[in-house]
Amino acid sequence: MAKNILIVGSGRQGISVAYDILKNSKHNVIISDINQECLDQAISKISGIVDTTNLSNAIVDVQDSQSMLKLLENMDVIVSAVPYEFNLALTDLAIKSKTSMVDLGGHTNIVRQQLSKNQQAISAGVTIVPDCGMGPGMNITMAVLATEILDKTDEIYICDGGLPKDPNPPWNYSLFFNIEGLTNEYDEQAYFLKDGKIVEVPCFSGIEIVSFDKIGELEAAVTSGGLSTMPWTFKDKLKVLENKTLRYKGHWEWMKAYRELGLFSRESINHDNNEIVPRNFYHQLLEKKLDHGRVEDICLMRISAKGTKDTKQVNLFIDAVEFYDKETDLTAMEKWTGWHISILAIQIADDKIEKGAISVENALKGHTFLEEAKKRNYNINIDIKEI
């Protein structure tokens, strides 16, 4: 039976999610936005790349709870493709309206608050899965896949990143999503597992060189939030769990300098009798420099795991690479981010995921994702080598 899936937000990821659900399921998609022009542009693009028989649209303000509740009366699943600050309120609306929900997360503290509503979600008969997407999201699911392949897993190292195919100096990066989300990843600290215990690790630390075939050498560094709640879930199961973000060489030194200057701060400062928030000022300047419009991109991911397989000590490598698709005009980042959350939305609509507020690592099995990824022509290579 076809379900109704509401996508809140008609930007890059909203378009990608709508495309994938329409292409790979029989469910109805309702895409919504507060801005009619953005919505019209999204519908026009979606109509050009997939059959839109099951697509409709709605104008709604995500902050207008009464309008949202009215819209949710006939919905089965919400896909939140809006910034993370709206997700906690949306979770409350989802539970109140008895509508399941998935979101793109981006802030672990908010995700924790969402997961604390597990009993409320169970009572409402709904499924809430926050922090989907590429990372956190797909990277976690791929790490879960590693634990499913090995008989016993001791260590997991993850590195992933979305990069422009043709980097522009000096930052060698293009903006593929909200700049606030980018700075949030570059600020605060990450949480890893070391000797089976949760440790706090500062952003931009542990910079190392990682090589990929046909791409060359990249720099991997610690950024925040990439593992979401996975360290807490696996603290009694893994000795080591780490996640780093990939960038072209030189990028991290610039970002470290900006942070040292205080440009990531949200604390107001007085300049010529004007109150200025450094982070807002920084975003206003840098966003224009990093937003290169529609550019061809590359997404890379590597899961390196150590453990036991058939009584032998082995190293397991799961490599994935994705490129911009000229036929659909979907970037690699849009595909990996949007399709991970759309796969979860479809799984929920098909009643394949239990009720409650569930973390990504507990919601979606690695092999289930691998099967769905193959249907979407993901380029994933799995290699096991005896130590």
Regions picked out by a protein language model, each given a short descriptive name:
Residues 13:
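Hydrophobic/small residue at the entry helix of a nucleotide-binding pocket
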Residues 35-38, 108:
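Helix N-cap at the beta1-alpha1 junction of Rossmann-like dinucleotide-binding domains, i.e.
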Residues 49-64:
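Rossmann-fold cofactor-recognition segment
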Residues 60-74:
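Conserved Rossmann-fold cofactor-binding substructure of NAD(P)-dependent oxidoreductases
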Residues 61, 76-91, 98, 105-109:
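N-terminal glycine-rich "phosphate-gripper" loop used for MgATP/nucleotide binding
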Residues 149-387:
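C-terminal catalytic/substrate-binding lobe primarily of soluble NAD(P)-dependent oxidoreductases
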